[in-house]
């Protein structure tokens, strides 16, 4: 189902619900979209998507960082509202991806690098059904400035292609989901490149898929626009998954409609 069609479905079939931010939403549960990464890079075209922001955010996740100062150095401010006065967010995505706490009596500081482990499985055990990364750590959720919205993802190898499915528990359809689609598609392409595979599918599965009440007018404007064909992306191969830089990515043929501004529900 195309993104725009899912939004229309939410607006016409969704349930009015309250939410943590007090804004109010129109919500549907358990929806799915699929994107063929062998043919295109799914960067939304009915409005401008901030590719620089999502690319730097992904690289920041892969660094395993909990502090936004590196993002600020690159003029990316998407996490500013949640950070404390020192720029810290607590043990959010990158920390869980790269250093999930797993203490033992022998090593109380032991951690698990989920990303490295999964990449190793993709390379050496491609039929494994355990190629999973989780950002949802119940023991640390209360320490996070914002609990993970995109909570868990799984990789799958078939016919020399790498696919990925994301489960997103909370889906801000206007501001968050376009970012998440492109970010995990980019990650899948990077992982495939490092493993010597071709990109397959990105499958997005959403739990609470919602349109905030104060985003409805923006969506009505957006849904009146005709989508352009998706662009493609060129990725210069880095020495390792953790050595990519923003300059290694080149989006090709990105034809898009203008930006539509909307408030963030914090």
From Swiss-Prot:
Residue sites binding (6R)-5,10-methylene-5,6,7,8-tetrahydrofolate per the record: 172, 265
Taxonomy, superkingdom: Bacteria
Catalyses which reaction(s): dUMP + (6R)-5,10-methylene-5,6,7,8-tetrahydrofolate = 7,8-dihydrofolate + dTMP
SUPFAM superfamilies: Thymidylate synthase/dCMP hydroxymethylase
Pathway membership: Pyrimidine metabolism; dTTP biosynthesis
A Pfam family the protein falls into: Thymidylat_synt
GO cellular component, one term: cytosol
GO biological process: one example: methylation
Molecular functions (GO terms): thymidylate synthase activity
Chief site of localization: cytoplasm
InterPro entries the record matches: Thymidate_synth/dCMP_Mease (IPR045097), Thymidate_synth/dCMP_Mease_dom (IPR023451), Thymidate_synth/dCMP_Mease_sf (IPR036926), Thymidylate_synthase (IPR000398), Thymidylate_synthase_AS (IPR020940)
Keywords: Cytoplasm, Methyltransferase, Nucleotide biosynthesis, Transferase
Regions annotated as coiled coil: none
Cited Gene3D superfamilies: Thymidylate synthase/dCMP hydroxymethylase domain (3.30.572.10)
Entry keyword Metal-binding: no
Assembly notes: Homodimer.
Function: Catalyzes the reductive methylation of 2'-deoxyuridine-5'-monophosphate (dUMP) to 2'-deoxythymidine-5'-monophosphate (dTMP) while utilizing 5,10-methylenetetrahydrofolate (mTHF) as the methyl donor and reductant in the reaction, yielding dihydrofolate (DHF) as a by-product. This enzymatic reaction provides an intracellular de novo source of dTMP, an essential precursor for DNA biosynthesis.
Official protein name in the record: Thymidylate synthase
Lineage: Bacteria, Bacillati, Actinomycetota, Actinomycetes, Bifidobacteriales
């Amino acid at each position: 189902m195309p993104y725009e069609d899912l939004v229309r479905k939410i607006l016409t079939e969704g349930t009015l619900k309250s939410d943590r931010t007090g804004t109010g939403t129109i919500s549907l549960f358990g929806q799915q979209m699929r994107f063929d990464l062998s043919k295109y890079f799914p960067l939304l075209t009915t409005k401008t998507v901030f590719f620089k922001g999502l690319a730097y955010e992904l690289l920041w996740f892969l660094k395993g960082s909990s502090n936004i100062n590196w993002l600020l150095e690159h003029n990316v401010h998407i996490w500013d509202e949640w950070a404390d006065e020192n720029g810290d967010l607590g043990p959010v995505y990158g920390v869980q991806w790269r250093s999930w706490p797993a203490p033992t009596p022998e090593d109380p500081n032991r951690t698990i690098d989920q990303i490295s482990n999964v990449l190793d499985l993709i390379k050496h055990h491609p039929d494994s059904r355990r190629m999973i990364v989780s950002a949802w750590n119940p023991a640390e959720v209360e320490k996070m400035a914002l609990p993970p919205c995109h909570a868990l993802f799984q990789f799958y190898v078939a016919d020399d292609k790498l696919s990925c499915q994301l489960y997103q528990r909370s889906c801000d359809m206007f501001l968050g989901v376009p970012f998440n689609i492109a970010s995990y598609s980019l990650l899948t392409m990077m992982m495939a490149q490092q493993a010597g595979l071709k990109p397959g599918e990105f499958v997005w599965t959403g739990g609470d898929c919602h349109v905030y009440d104060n985003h409805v007018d923006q969506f009505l404007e957006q849904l009146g626009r005709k989508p352009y064909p998706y662009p493609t992306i060129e990725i210069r191969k880095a020495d390792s998954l953790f050595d990519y830089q923003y300059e290694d990515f080149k989006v090709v043929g990105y034809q898009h409609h203008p930006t539509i501004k909307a408030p963030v529900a914090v």
